[in-house]
């Protein structure tokens, strides 16, 4: 929860979803701690590995047969082969991981490094981040919890809930506080697991529901344990695996009044260290307000910032003037005149050849289409040149007498 959104007081709600009179609690400093999803995810992955049970294949697997290599000189692989004869099995490869009935490559051992050590301060940082994220409604809703009717976040209820001993009373309590919609989500999500887990007593899977954090168990655990999705935990034994299942922050947490009031003693504040954890100080956020858009648009920062640069840097296209005519004309404008002269000279030579050939063969030019076109082009060119000469002569000033 950012410092800008934190409230100084939190209301305590009764079993009937009514704010208790004169029972407002100061928001613990742990809810203002920085939220670090990266730390939570990393620590969760390490802690989850500590629950694994050691497994390995049998040391004798794949070696419970008599086999010996035939050696070299028989044009067959040197893999050990089963002894004997009179059966399909004799002569077949054995022992190797590429053989049928052989052992696996690098057989698994029970002395693998199953557990991972996590620094105490890192574990506490992840736990603090998960608690702080549970007080942000947007993060809780993004996790998939149905919290449309919940009155306030973080949700704190009176200690009378700890005395509930019947599941029927617990269901009534959840319905009154508008939490039952989240339990219905759990009911709808119940399904059979895909894979081998169905044969290993892990048949059904479902979504997670709310987490109830209490201080003293006076029947609360037995009352809530038969409701799907709901989990309970003591405030002194807060666990990251329950506060951030899957390594994702935003679990919906219901706090009892006494458990909520105990958070300052457990994690301390920024003015005094924790009284229950030796030498632990609550991590401070590097930014008091995490709304970057609001900060960058503020007048104080805008006065210091310089105006944006509006220069446009265009990349220069490197063109070869020997192959690109436009680039050649750009570098040497007279090249256009030379090219035009060369084209005219070539056309003139072509016309001369056609005329000479027609004269030699006594062919009339009117009947020859190419010669006719060439003569017309020559005539048009002569007209254009004459018109240009007239324009140039008209522009020249008349000579004085």
Swiss-Prot record:
**Gene Ontology MF terms:** RNA binding; structural constituent of ribosome
Q: Which gene encodes it?
A: RpL4
Its keywords, alphabetically, are: Ribonucleoprotein, Ribosomal protein
Q: Which PANTHER family match?
A: 60S RIBOSOMAL PROTEIN L4
Keyword Glycoprotein belongs to the record: no
Q: Which family does it belong to?
A: Belongs to the universal ribosomal protein uL4 family.
InterPro entries of this UniProt entry?
Ribos_uL4_C_dom, Ribosomal_uL4, Ribosomal_uL4_dom_sf, Ribosomal_uL4_euk/arc_CS, Ribosomal_uL4_euk/arch
One Pfam short name? Ribos_L4_asso_C
Stated name of the protein: Large ribosomal subunit protein uL4
Tell me which domain of life the UniProt entry assigns to the organism this sequence originates from. Eukaryota
Its GO biological process annotations read:
cytoplasmic translation
GO CC list: cytosolic large ribosomal subunit; cytosolic ribosome
**Originating species:** Drosophila melanogaster (Fruit fly)
Report if keyword Ribonucleoprotein is assigned. yes
């Amino acid at each position: 929860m950012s410092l800008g959104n934190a409230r100084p007081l939190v209301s305590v709600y009764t079993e009937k979803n009514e704010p208790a009179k004169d029972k407002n609690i100061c928001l613990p400093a742990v809810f203002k701690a920085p939220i670090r999803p990266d730390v939570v995810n990393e620590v969760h992955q390490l802690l989850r590995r500590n629950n694994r049970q050691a497994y390995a294949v049998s040391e004798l697997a794949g070696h419970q047969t008599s086999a010996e290599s035939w050696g070299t000189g028989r044009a067959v692989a040197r893999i050990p082969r089963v002894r004997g004869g009179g059966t399909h099995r004799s002569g077949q490869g054995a022992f190797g991981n590429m053989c049928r009935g052989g052992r696996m490559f690098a057989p698994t051992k029970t002395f693998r490094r199953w557990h991972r050590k996590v620094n105490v301060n890192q574990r506490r940082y992840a736990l603090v981040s998960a608690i702080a994220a549970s007080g942000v409604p947007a993060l809780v809703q993004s996790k998939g919890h149905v919290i449309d009717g919940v009155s306030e976040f973080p949700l704190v209820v009176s200690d009378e809930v700890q005395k509930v001993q019947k599941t029927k009373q617990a269901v009534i309590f959840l319905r009154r506080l508008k939490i039952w919609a989240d339990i219905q989500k759990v009911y709808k999500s119940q399904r059979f697991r895909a894979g081998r887990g169905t044969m290993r007593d892990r048949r059904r899977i479902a979504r997670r529901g709310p987490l109830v954090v209490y201080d003293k168990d006076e029947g609360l655990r037995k009352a809530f344990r038969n409701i799907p999705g709901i989990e309970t935990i003591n405030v002194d034994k807060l666990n990251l695996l329950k506060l951030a299942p899957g390594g994702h922050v935003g679990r919906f947490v219901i706090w009892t009044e006494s458990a909520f009031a105990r958070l300052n003693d457990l994690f301390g504040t920024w003015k005094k260290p924790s009284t229950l954890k030796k030498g632990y100080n609550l991590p401070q956020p590097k930014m008091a307000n995490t709304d970057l858009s609001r900060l960058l648009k503020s007048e104080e920062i805008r006065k210091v910032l310089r105006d944006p640069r509006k220069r446009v840097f265009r990349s220069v296209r490197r063109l070869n003037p020997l192959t690109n005519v436009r680039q050649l004309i750009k570098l040497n404008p007279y090249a256009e005149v030379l090219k035009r002269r060369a084209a005219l000279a070539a056309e003139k030579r072509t016309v001369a050849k056609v005329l000479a050939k027609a004269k030699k063969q006594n062919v009339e030019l009117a009947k020859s289409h190419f010669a006719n076109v060439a003569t017309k082009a020559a005539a048009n060119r002569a007209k254009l040149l004459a018109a240009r000469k007239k324009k140039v002569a008209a522009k020249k000033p008349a000579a004085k007498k």
